[in-house]
Every structure is written in C-alpha cells, then in structure tokens.
C-alpha cells in the first residue's frame, strides 16, 4: 500500500474544544464543522466535539447528516436558506438558519414553517460579505420579530480582522451600539476573537480552526495557545537520488544543487492535498529532523533535502504537517493558510484515527 496516510486525533480535537470553552466562559459553544469538519470527517468531529452545545455547518445536507447521526443539539446553518423550499426542512430537522438578506425574510413571510424557527439575524458590521446593513437594524429586527414562523432571534456579525493588528473594535463597537437596545442575545466570536478579545464572547461563540489545532493568528503558534494538532499527514521516502553540483530535480528543474547532495522522493503530491505552489524550502520532517522541500511539487510526489539526514533512506518516515511540524508553518511557507491545507486533504488519502476514540478505524478522507 502507498505509505501516505493522515492520522487524526479525536483526543486532540476534544482538548481544543476544552480550550475554546475556557475562553467562552458562560457563553454556549457552536463547534464549526463545515467543509467535512475542515477535512477531518464529520462523524469523527461529532465524537470529538460531543461536549459542544451545538454545531455550525454550511449546508442543509451537512445538517441532515448530523441529525441522521443522532445529533439532537442546535445546528446553525451559517449561510441560511437558499430558497423557500428549504424552510420546511429547517422545521422538520429543527435547524437554526442565519438570515442575512431580505429575500429570506420574504420567503418566511410567504411560507410559514410547520414549527416556528430559532434564527440568527446577521448584520454586516464592516466585512461587507453577508448581513443586513447596520443602519437598517430597527426595521429589520422589527420585521423578523413580527414573523409568525420565527420563535427566537439571536443577533450575529462576523469579524474581518480579528486575526490581525486591526482587531475588532471598529466592528464590535457599532454592532453593539446599534443592537444592544433590542435586548436580544448575540454572537460574534470566531476562533481569533474568542482567544484574543473577551469582549466579543456574547451568548454564543463559533470556534472553527482552533478546534483542529491550528492557530488563527500569524504571530502566535498553536502551541502558544495551548492547542494540539488534530491531523498529521505522514508518508515515507520511496526513492533517493544523488545530485552532483549543478544538477536539478523535478519538473522544470527549478532547484539545482550547488554542491553534491542527496534528495529523497516522498510519496505525497498535490493530488493528495499538498499545496502545488509550495516553493523550495517549505519545511518537512524526515526521521524526526526538520528539513526542506526541493523543486516543484508533482501530482503524486515531492522531493526533500537529505543533507541533514545522513541516515535517511527508502522507508524513512516523513511528516508533511502535524505532530512536530505545525500546519501553520507549512501554510506560511506555501503562501496559503492552514484552513486551505486541512480542507484540501484528498479523498484518496487513508485516514487512521488515533487516541481513545477509534470506533471508525481506518477509512478515507471523504468519510
């Protein structure tokens, strides 16, 4: 069998949820499990995040899967309903849709659900992505409260720069000033806001990336936040090449040796989810030693520098990210984010669960 695999630790995920809960205080916690739980598998996330107060997903299909798995806790639909036909499913499955544009309100006025829904009413406080304008808050809140198909309302916004130096005040202050007078519960904190800005906690928090052991910040590593990596992508060296000075390796020969050296060929490529654009120098660990990639990443293989790994050879263990090599470090070197790397794990990569919670055994990335 090809040696690449991803090890996923439910124990690490459960630990990271406990970290989130410590920051949340008395607020309730939605575990964000969209995008197949950031590539970790929805069923695995469900077992790991059993202590969450609810789950946040993107689509009706994800929500239905959670209900089929036996989840009876609140499920938040982060983009709400996409057409009037989804209202009935929200009622049947007891889902909490996010309402963020007027057509959704029109649908709820025209088609009363079989049971009144709990909804999250989203306002745009400056990110300019989803949400009603804050200037329209009085009219919008009154309209939603008047809907016979709505049982309870929670106010919501999302931060654009909680993870950088601009912070959240420029969004949080106008959001609170506009909406506090309505006397409704509210939710604003994502992972970055939850860990850095306690004033954003509100009544519900929505941690995502931190639950999977990656840092939401570029200036603080995950270990510095007390987080543990949930996914470790491993493989092995399947060939060793000896390069003379001036010789290149891989497509385009973009790397050329400046002296004689050994290079290892690793069974991992962009078809496995490794970033194709990762340049020479992207960190990798071989037999416990940190080294670097060489040249272009191929579909099924990549090459690594063995200069500092004299004992390495065919069969040597390689960590692409995870235990001993933060996914954030790989993402930074490749000019991307840990979110993208984790979500991009390919279905062809076998997954092995580690830790106490191993009911699913060995499977594949799309399970």
From Swiss-Prot:
Report the InterPro entries cross-referenced here: Ala_racemase, Ala_racemase/Decarboxylase_C, Ala_racemase_C, Ala_racemase_N, Ala_racemase_pyridoxalP-BS, PLP-binding_barrel
**Active-site residues per Swiss-Prot or TrEMBL entry:** 34, 251
Is Isomerase included in the keywords of this UniProt record? yes
Q: Which PROSITE patterns match?
A: ALANINE_RACEMASE
GO CC terms in record: cytosol
Q: What EC identifiers does the entry list?
A: 5.1.1.1
Superkingdom of the organism of origin: Bacteria
Annotated residues that bind substrate are located at: 129, 299
What SUPFAM superfamilies does the entry give? Answer: Alanine racemase C-terminal domain-like, PLP-binding barrel
Q: Name one GO molecular function term.
A: pyridoxal phosphate binding
Which UniProt keywords are given for this protein, alphabetically ordered? Answer: Isomerase, Pyridoxal phosphate
Q: Which cofactor does it need?
A: pyridoxal 5'-phosphate
Give the matching SMART domains.
Ala_racemase_C (SM01005)
Which catalysed reactions does the entry list for this protein?
Answer: L-alanine = D-alanine
Q: Record's family?
A: Belongs to the alanine racemase family.
Primary role: Catalyzes the interconversion of L-alanine and D-alanine. May also act on other amino acids.
Q: Which NCBIfam families match?
A: alr
Name of the protein described by the UniProt record = Alanine racemase
Organism this protein belongs to: Thiobacillus denitrificans (strain ATCC 25259 / T1)
